[in-house]
Regions:
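Mature, Sec-exported extracytoplasmic domains of Gram-positive
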Residues: 2-168
Length: 168
Protein backbone atom coordinates (compact mmCIF):
# COMPACT_ATOMS: atom_id res chain seq x y z
CA UNK A 1 0.00 0.00 0.00
CA UNK A 2 2.83 2.36 0.87
CA UNK A 3 4.51 1.58 -2.45
CA UNK A 4 1.31 2.53 -4.30
CA UNK A 5 1.24 5.82 -2.40
CA UNK A 6 4.88 6.54 -3.28
CA UNK A 7 4.22 5.73 -6.94
CA UNK A 8 1.23 8.07 -6.94
CA UNK A 9 3.36 10.87 -5.43
CA UNK A 10 6.08 10.34 -8.07
CA UNK A 11 3.50 10.45 -10.88
CA UNK A 12 1.98 13.66 -9.44
CA UNK A 13 5.43 15.25 -9.19
CA UNK A 14 6.20 14.35 -12.81
CA UNK A 15 2.84 15.76 -13.95
CA UNK A 16 3.51 19.02 -12.08
CA UNK A 17 6.90 19.32 -13.74
CA UNK A 18 5.46 18.71 -17.21
CA UNK A 19 2.73 21.28 -16.50
CA UNK A 20 5.35 23.86 -15.43
CA UNK A 21 7.44 23.04 -18.49
CA UNK A 22 4.47 23.53 -20.84
CA UNK A 23 3.40 26.83 -19.25
CA UNK A 24 6.89 28.31 -19.52
CA UNK A 25 7.17 27.01 -23.08
CA UNK A 26 3.84 28.70 -23.92
CA UNK A 27 5.17 32.02 -22.60
CA UNK A 28 8.14 32.17 -24.96
CA UNK A 29 7.68 35.06 -27.34
CA UNK A 30 4.49 36.29 -25.67
CA UNK A 31 4.21 40.07 -25.38
CA UNK A 32 0.89 40.77 -23.68
CA UNK A 33 1.42 41.34 -19.92
CA UNK A 34 -2.12 40.07 -19.22
CA UNK A 35 -1.34 36.77 -20.95
CA UNK A 36 1.94 36.49 -19.05
CA UNK A 37 0.30 37.12 -15.68
CA UNK A 38 -2.50 34.70 -16.47
CA UNK A 39 -0.05 31.96 -17.46
CA UNK A 40 2.19 32.68 -14.48
CA UNK A 41 -0.74 32.32 -12.10
CA UNK A 42 -1.07 28.68 -13.18
CA UNK A 43 2.49 27.82 -12.21
CA UNK A 44 3.05 25.78 -9.06
CA UNK A 45 6.10 28.08 -8.49
CA UNK A 46 8.38 25.37 -7.22
CA UNK A 47 11.83 26.97 -7.33
CA UNK A 48 13.55 23.62 -7.86
CA UNK A 49 11.50 23.10 -11.02
CA UNK A 50 12.19 26.61 -12.27
CA UNK A 51 15.95 26.70 -11.68
CA UNK A 52 16.55 25.23 -15.13
CA UNK A 53 15.06 28.34 -16.76
CA UNK A 54 16.87 31.64 -17.26
CA UNK A 55 15.33 34.90 -16.11
CA UNK A 56 13.02 35.97 -18.91
CA UNK A 57 11.97 39.59 -19.02
CA UNK A 58 9.19 41.23 -21.00
CA UNK A 59 8.24 44.87 -20.77
CA UNK A 60 4.86 46.45 -21.29
CA UNK A 61 6.56 48.30 -24.17
CA UNK A 62 6.65 44.93 -25.99
CA UNK A 63 10.39 44.39 -25.88
CA UNK A 64 12.39 41.56 -24.40
CA UNK A 65 15.16 42.35 -21.93
CA UNK A 66 17.34 40.27 -19.69
CA UNK A 67 17.60 41.10 -16.00
CA UNK A 68 21.31 41.79 -16.54
CA UNK A 69 20.55 44.33 -19.29
CA UNK A 70 18.08 46.08 -17.02
CA UNK A 71 20.62 46.41 -14.19
CA UNK A 72 23.35 47.51 -16.62
CA UNK A 73 21.10 50.24 -18.00
CA UNK A 74 20.29 51.38 -14.46
CA UNK A 75 24.02 51.48 -13.68
CA UNK A 76 24.83 53.47 -16.85
CA UNK A 77 22.06 56.01 -16.16
CA UNK A 78 23.31 56.37 -12.59
CA UNK A 79 26.92 56.95 -13.67
CA UNK A 80 25.80 59.64 -16.11
CA UNK A 81 24.00 61.43 -13.28
CA UNK A 82 20.52 60.83 -14.68
CA UNK A 83 17.84 60.22 -12.11
CA UNK A 84 16.92 56.57 -12.26
CA UNK A 85 14.83 54.38 -10.03
CA UNK A 86 14.14 50.70 -10.07
CA UNK A 87 11.18 49.17 -8.28
CA UNK A 88 11.08 45.45 -7.70
CA UNK A 89 8.22 43.46 -6.27
CA UNK A 90 9.13 40.13 -4.73
CA UNK A 91 7.06 37.58 -2.96
CA UNK A 92 8.14 34.92 -0.54
CA UNK A 93 6.89 31.41 -1.20
CA UNK A 94 8.15 28.40 0.72
CA UNK A 95 10.87 30.58 2.27
CA UNK A 96 12.29 31.62 -1.13
CA UNK A 97 12.05 35.17 -2.47
CA UNK A 98 10.76 35.10 -6.03
CA UNK A 99 10.94 38.22 -8.19
CA UNK A 100 7.72 38.69 -10.09
CA UNK A 101 8.16 42.08 -11.74
CA UNK A 102 10.43 45.07 -11.88
CA UNK A 103 9.68 48.62 -12.93
CA UNK A 104 12.41 50.85 -14.35
CA UNK A 105 11.53 54.50 -14.96
CA UNK A 106 7.90 53.75 -15.72
CA UNK A 107 8.35 50.63 -17.86
CA UNK A 108 7.10 47.43 -16.28
CA UNK A 109 9.10 44.26 -16.74
CA UNK A 110 7.70 40.84 -15.92
CA UNK A 111 10.30 38.37 -14.72
CA UNK A 112 9.49 34.69 -14.71
CA UNK A 113 11.90 33.75 -12.00
CA UNK A 114 14.45 35.03 -9.53
CA UNK A 115 16.45 33.15 -6.96
CA UNK A 116 16.77 35.34 -3.91
CA UNK A 117 17.03 33.58 -0.58
CA UNK A 118 14.90 35.04 2.19
CA UNK A 119 16.77 37.34 4.53
CA UNK A 120 19.69 38.19 2.26
CA UNK A 121 17.97 40.46 -0.22
CA UNK A 122 19.07 43.77 1.34
CA UNK A 123 22.73 42.75 1.67
CA UNK A 124 22.85 41.29 -1.84
CA UNK A 125 21.43 44.36 -3.53
CA UNK A 126 23.44 46.92 -1.55
CA UNK A 127 26.56 45.38 -3.08
CA UNK A 128 25.22 46.32 -6.50
CA UNK A 129 24.93 49.79 -8.01
CA UNK A 130 22.37 51.30 -5.69
CA UNK A 131 22.92 54.16 -3.27
CA UNK A 132 19.57 53.76 -1.61
CA UNK A 133 17.32 50.81 -0.92
CA UNK A 134 13.90 51.22 0.63
CA UNK A 135 11.65 48.37 1.64
CA UNK A 136 8.35 50.20 1.65
CA UNK A 137 5.87 47.39 1.96
CA UNK A 138 6.04 43.92 3.42
CA UNK A 139 2.86 42.02 4.05
CA UNK A 140 1.65 38.47 4.39
CA UNK A 141 -0.64 37.72 1.46
CA UNK A 142 -1.49 34.17 2.37
CA UNK A 143 -0.25 31.54 4.76
CA UNK A 144 3.37 30.90 3.81
CA UNK A 145 3.39 33.66 1.18
CA UNK A 146 4.58 37.24 1.73
CA UNK A 147 4.96 40.19 -0.60
CA UNK A 148 7.78 42.70 -0.36
CA UNK A 149 8.07 45.92 -2.35
CA UNK A 150 11.55 47.35 -2.78
CA UNK A 151 12.60 50.64 -4.37
CA UNK A 152 16.20 51.20 -5.46
CA UNK A 153 17.51 54.65 -6.30
CA UNK A 154 20.77 56.16 -7.48
CA UNK A 155 20.15 59.09 -5.12
CA UNK A 156 21.53 58.87 -1.61
CA UNK A 157 19.48 58.91 1.59
CA UNK A 158 16.04 58.55 0.02
CA UNK A 159 13.39 58.37 2.72
CA UNK A 160 10.73 55.67 2.76
CA UNK A 161 8.12 58.41 2.21
CA UNK A 162 9.89 59.61 -0.96
CA UNK A 163 10.18 56.05 -2.21
CA UNK A 164 6.51 55.44 -1.53
CA UNK A 165 5.63 58.64 -3.40
CA UNK A 166 7.51 57.34 -6.44
CA UNK A 167 5.48 54.13 -6.41
CA UNK A 168 2.19 56.06 -6.18
Amino acid sequence: EQTDEQTQEAVQEAENFVQTDNILENLKGKRDPEVILQEMSKLPFNMEDLKAYPVYVLSDQFEERSGAELLTEFYEQSKQGNLAQLLMVNYCYNEKWILSYAEFDGSTYYLLRGNIDAGTVEEDYKEMYFHSLNIIEKKEVDQGMSLIMIVFSNQENVSDEQAEQYVK
